[in-house]
Regions:
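Solvent-exposed soluble domains appended to multi-pass membrane proteins
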Residues: 1-154
Length: 154
C-alpha cells in the first residue's frame, strides 16, 4: 500500500507540474522564469527495499549518519524562456543551506559577501554543510553571520 500511494502521488505530481509549467507559459508569455525543485530524503518505504534486515534503531542511526542509501539530496533546475546563467555551483552533493547560492547564480544575480563566503565553505566541504568537519564549518560560518548582525535573537 505504501508503494502504491507513493506511485499514485508521484503520478499526480508529474501531471500537476506539467499543468503548472503550462499555466506559467500561458499567464506569463515571454517572461523569464527559473523553477527549482528540491528534496532530501528517500520515500519512507525505501528502507525495506534498501536493507530490509535493519531494525528501527540501526536505521535511525544510519539516517543520522547521513548514509547516502537513505538520505540523498536531489534538485532540478529548469528555465522557461530562460537559460540559467551559471550552474557552476550545482554540485552532485548539495545540502539545503547551499541551495540559495545555486538559485542566485542560475538567475544571474551577484552573491553578497555572506553568500560568497558560504560558497567558499560549500567548495571546501564538497556540498556538505552540517556534516562537514564534524559541524565546525557550519558553526564558524553561522558565527560570522551572528557577528555581522545578520542573525539576531538566538
Amino acid at each position: 500500500p505504501e508503494v502504491d500511494e507513493y506511485l499514485r502521488r508521484q503520478s499526480m505530481s508529474a501531471v500537476d507540474y506539467k499543468a503548472f509549467v503550462e499555466r506559467l507559459k500561458k499567464e506569463l508569455p515571454g517572461e523569464p522564469i527559473l523553477i527549482v525543485r528540491f528534496g532530501d530524503h528517500q520515500p519512507s518505504f525505501a528502507k525495506h527495499m534498501v536493507d530490509p534486515a535493519l531494525d528501527d534503531t540501526v536505521l535511525a542511526r544510519r539516517i543520522a549518519e547521513a548514509d547516502p542509501r537513505f538520505l540523498a539530496t536531489y534538485y532540478a533546475i529548469e528555465g522557461i524562456n530562460f537559460k540559467p546563467a551559471s550552474l557552476s555551483s550545482a554540485l552532485d552533493t548539495l545540502d539545503a543551506p547551499y541551495l540559495p547560492i545555486v538559485v542566485m547564480e542560475a538567475a544571474g544575480l551577484p552573491l553578497d559577501p555572506s553568500f560568497a563566503e558560504q560558497k567558499r565553505v560549500m567548495k571546501r566541504c564538497n556540498g556538505l554543510f552540517y556534516r562537514c568537519a564534524a559541524g565546525a564549518e557550519a558553526k564558524r560560518f553561522n558565527r560570522l553571520l551572528i557577528e555581522a548582525g545578520l542573525i539576531k535573537r538566538l
